[in-house]
């Protein structure tokens, strides 16, 4: 039974590998599904391990390796493929893998730092991956400068000192209402924008976290 979290972690990694394959053949719909499921498994492997008291150093290291694949290599490969469709010169094509390097650095820093249970310092790698995997589905003609700017900004956010809100499952009315509002809002976005809703949801999450932090600081 104690191996359940590790099995879920390996499922996360397997889905990341699957996403890479589907990105390579330009099947972004299936790649998006793989990353979304990988994020679900990533949530539940840690949740189950903490709830049942099954946390271990091995599990933490395995989780980081899986996250590098699903939430580091995948968005890096995706942006690289997107750059190739813009007829960008070769040195610039590989610029997308800066996301991979920034993600790996963040995960290593996360594993060796004291982490709060109330918030994340820097944008979580799953959130960043979900942001990028939704981009090809947005009804917007991407330009090279826009994509380049997005790569730089998100790579910074991954390792920034900014505080990001950490949603937690709690037995309280406030928590229930907040989760319900988030689910309804995401459902509305999904009905309107399809898979592109993932990108919009993460953008809203970033804005919400920054606003929440500013309001909290203003109250002392």
Each language-model region and where it sits:
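Multi-pass membrane catalytic core of lipid/isoprenoid biosynthesis enzymes
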Residues: 4-9, 51-108
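Helix-coil boundary and interhelical linker segments in multi-pass alpha-helical membrane proteins
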Residues: 18-34, 73-97, 133-148, 190-196
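Short, amphipathic, aromatic/basic-enriched membrane-interface segments that mark the entry/exit
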Residues: 1-7, 60-65, 113-121, 164-174
């Amino acid at each position: 039974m104690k191996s359940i979290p590790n099995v879920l972690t390996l499922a996360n990694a397997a889905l990341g590998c699957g996403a890479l394959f589907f990105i390579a053949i330009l099947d972004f719909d299936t790649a998006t599904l793989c990353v979304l499921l990988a994020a679900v498994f990533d949530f539940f492997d840690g949740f189950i391990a903490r709830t049942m008291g099954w946390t271990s150093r091995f599990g933490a290291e395995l989780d980081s390796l899986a996250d590098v694949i699903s939430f580091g290599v995948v968005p890096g490969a995706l942006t690289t493929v997107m750059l190739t469709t813009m007829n960008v010169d070769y040195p610039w094509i590989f610029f997308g893998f800066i996301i991979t390097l920034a993600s790996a650095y963040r995960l290593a820093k996360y594993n060796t730092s004291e982490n709060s249970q109330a918030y994340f310092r820097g944008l979580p790698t799953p959130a960043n991956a979900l942001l990028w995997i939704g981009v090809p589905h947005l009804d917007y003609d991407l330009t090279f400068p826009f994509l380049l700017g997005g790569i730089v900004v998100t790579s910074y956010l991954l390792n920034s000192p900014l505080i990001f809100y950490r949603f937690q499952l709690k037995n309280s009315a406030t928590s229930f209402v907040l989760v319900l509002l988030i689910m309804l809002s995401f459902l509305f976005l999904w009905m309107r924008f399809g898979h592109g809703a993932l990108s919009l949801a993460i953008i809203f999450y970033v804005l919400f976290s920054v606003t929440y932090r500013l309001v909290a600081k203003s109250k002392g």
